[in-house]
């Protein structure tokens, strides 16, 4: 049992390291909050940019012209960020990850929530 717990804990560390690592081109990943402006104003990840999920297809080109750039998206529960992920992939972005909720994203990336 101890071996299983150790393995699971180690896997979490590896996942966290993978998500906070730099992209293939050596750049930090782009973190996008796909919630509403009101939700953003109540708290968001430090370093994230706000692009609501319903306009991400129109606005993404202003922050990520390179379609190989590593992009992480998050929202309140993971539903809107999953929609945003699908939109970005349809537009040809190749390295998009759904981090789920704001809290999950902050935990996974070891980031700070700014309120």
Predicted regions and their residues:
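Bacterial N-terminal signal peptides
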Residues: 8-18
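Boundary of Sec targeting at the N-terminus
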Residues: 19-25
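Rhodanese-like catalytic fold shared by cysteine-dependent sulfurtransferases
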Residues: 2-4, 8, 25-30, 37-70, ...
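Short, surface-exposed ligand- or partner-binding patches at beta-edge/loop junctions that are enriched
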Residues: 74
